[in-house]
Amino acid sequence: MTHEARLAQRTLIFTADDFGLHERVNEAVERAHLHGVLTAASLMVAAPAARDAIARAHRLPELRVGLHLVLADGAAFLPRDAIPALVDADGRFDDNMVRDGFRFFFLPHVRKQLALEIRAQFEAFAKTGLPLDHVNTHKHFHLHPTVLGLIVEIGRDYGMRAMRLPCESREPLWLKPWIGLVRDRLDRAGIAHNDYVVGIANTGRMTEGVLLEALAHLPDGVGEIYCHPAVVGEGALTQGMRGYRHADELAALLSPRVEAAIEAAGATRGGFADVFGQAHDRGVQPS
């Protein structure tokens, strides 16, 4: 899409992250897509309910599914003995992203293992048989130049055409140069990306009120509104999600008021493939 085309319209991609984390998430994704405004979901290929998520996705041919690369605070795809420098005894990444970022940048053997894990997750997604709509990372780790470089390099082998640019209007000033570098790198590589996101400042709290406020002040261009819906259940999905309002986020995606606000804003909806003209895999246009 040309710059002029972006400015001529408002286009929204509604994405659910952590698809596959739990069946409660998967059920919410299915409901929000069939009966609400959700257009896309990002799959965690090593998550406990990934198989269930994949089965649901195959039943939902208009749901655009991408790869949610997990390189922090989650389970790795490869066994621990293949990537011992990356994971703990249980095969999980920790959440000290600053320390890991330094290790990725300065230690060649760590970078090599990181590349192996990234490729393994791409390969696992390819084996699902689902078209790859987009790629993003858990906790936006692709803001790190080493991580981004490996994703761009490896993603070419798997038909990656679009990535999330985690650029929100209220981002801190110190982050703007990093966002600019990511944008430039994606543009040079010919990888499509959104112009802005909604969801960082209110992660876990993307309620109806938050969505209505965002929709009332939409800029022109391509926006991605991402959230973490799940149906009601016992206990937190993860330790880090204890305060997340998953059910309220699902209700927001199902809200007739939200759907009406999208129409009032003159915005169309779709996945990355729809928005950026890659719909040849399924032949569906933005709604």
Question: At which residue positions do the language-model features occur?
Answer:
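Terminal accessory/targeting
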Residues: 1-16, 23-134, 145-287
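Active-site histidine-anchored catalytic micro-motif
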Residues: 137-139
